[in-house]
Amino acid sequence: MAINIEYVILRHLQMELKAPFTTSFGTFQTKEFILVEVVDCDGVSGWGESVAFSVPWYSEETVKTNWHMLEEFLVPLLFSKPLRHPAELPERFAAIRQNNMAKAALEGAVWDLYAKRLGVPLCQALGGTKKEIEVGVSIGIQPTVDDLLQVIERYVAQGYRRIKVKIKPGWDVDVIRDVRRAFPDVPLMADANSAYTLADAKRLQALDEFGLMMIEQPLAADDLVDHARLQPLLKTPICLDESIRSYDDARKALDLGSCRIINIKIGRVGGLWEAKRIHDLCAERGVPVWCGGMLEAGVGRAHNIAITTLENFALPGDTAASSHYWERDIITPEVEVHNGLIRVPNAPGIGYDVDRRQVERYTQFAKLFHRTATA
């Protein structure tokens, strides 16, 4: 089936978070991002969302660099020759080094359009089978431990299946001890966002007594070797996040023994197709995966739901309800969580309608690219 895209619209949005979100590398009060719309010759739209932040804390990509890459390189490549399947895009985009989040935003929009043209949900187009998915919640660093415990209590009461707590040096062992004392049976994990080095191995070993599901990305964001040295020293499984940017990174991590779990983020690895390839590799190796979050708005959240329907997404992901982050999301209906579960939508494409009124409200500026102008 030919995918005849006539034009692409890039929109720069800014949305206010309901509460500040703090990690070991910074605090977010607003989220800027690029919303990508691709429109075919029949006027059908597909939607994608860039997950890059406005500053290069998580990776080298930012909203501004993503816009530049999309405008100058990726959109022209999309229009450069006929397209029959979204899985062709990774090879087409391979001439552009890195810039995975920009690639994923455009590829995701094409996947949404492709599924709509087939008349099937995006999850089905990807090979997913689940009708509902288990989700957890990620909680940023709080002003005090009491504040953290209150936030956790609220989300446990709402039925979330897993609690993730951000840690950093000085906010780690004692904090996790207090959390575990207050919530002895809650599935719990810690996310370090690369805040430690191998010199901190004993401090990280001290977390073993708390029965954590995993510790996420304790060491450097580009490291596999030191994680392979650290993992045998810990009872707690290491989960890699920032270190895994491709199928090859995942293969090397598994070969080295750098981790026992992998967090898959669509934007970080360059798109849905690469995410699926990593999922399939981990399934073959018996390594569970889960879907991480990047403070996505509704479109990105919908893509996360779709990929999580693949069988080896065996652990609850970070795809919390829209209301966890936003007063008003950009999709209808908004993503809702009931007893720790999200029901997977069965409408074609991402399964949610984009609320153009809300998109307009949050849009700072936009630009349209027509096939004939870029071909």
Swiss-Prot record:
Involved pathway(s): Quinol/quinone metabolism; 1,4-dihydroxy-2-naphthoate biosynthesis; 1,4-dihydroxy-2-naphthoate from chorismate: step 4/7; Quinol/quinone metabolism; menaquinone biosynthesis
Concerning SMART domains, the annotation shows: MR_MLE
> Which NCBIfam families does the record associate with it?
menC_lowGC_arch
Positions annotated to bind Mg(2+): 191, 216, 241
EC annotation from Swiss-Prot or TrEMBL:
4.2.1.113, 5.1.1.-
How does the record describe its quaternary structure? Homotetramer.
| Positions of the catalytic residues | 166 (proton donor), 265 (proton acceptor)
Name one matching Pfam family: MR_MLE_C
From its record, what is one biological process in GO terms?
menaquinone biosynthetic process
Instruction: Name the encoding gene, please.
Output: menC
Cofactor(s) demanded:
a divalent metal cation
The Swiss-Prot or TrEMBL record describes its family as follows: Belongs to the mandelate racemase/muconate lactonizing enzyme family. MenC type 2 subfamily.
Stated name of the protein: o-succinylbenzoate synthase
Q: What does this protein do?
A: Converts 2-succinyl-6-hydroxy-2,4-cyclohexadiene-1-carboxylate (SHCHC) to 2-succinylbenzoate (OSB). Also acts as a N-succinylamino acid racemase (NSAR) that catalyzes the racemization of various N-succinylamino acids, including N-succinyl-alanine and N-succinyl-phenylalanine. Can catalyze the racemization of a broad range of N-acylamino acids, including N-acetyl-methionine, N-acetyl-phenylalanine, N-carbamoyl-methionine, N-formyl-D-methionine, N-formyl-D-norleucine and N-carbamoyl-D-norleucine.
- Keyword rRNA-binding in the entry? The reply is no
**What does the record give as the reaction this protein catalyses?**
(1R,6R)-6-hydroxy-2-succinyl-cyclohexa-2,4-diene-1-carboxylate = 2-succinylbenzoate + H2O; N-acetyl-D-methionine = N-acetyl-L-methionine; N-acetyl-D-phenylalanine = N-acetyl-L-phenylalanine
> Which keywords does UniProt give here?
Isomerase, Lyase, Magnesium, Menaquinone biosynthesis, Metal-binding
Per its UniProt record, what CDD domains does this chain match? NAAAR (cd03317)
Q: How does activity depend on pH?
A: Optimum pH is 8.0.
- Species the sequence originates in: Geobacillus kaustophilus
Record has Secreted as a keyword? no
Q: Which InterPro entries match?
A: Enolase-like_C_sf, Enolase-like_N, Enolase_C-like, Mandelate_racemase_C, Mandelate_racemase_N_dom, MenC, OSBS/NAAAR
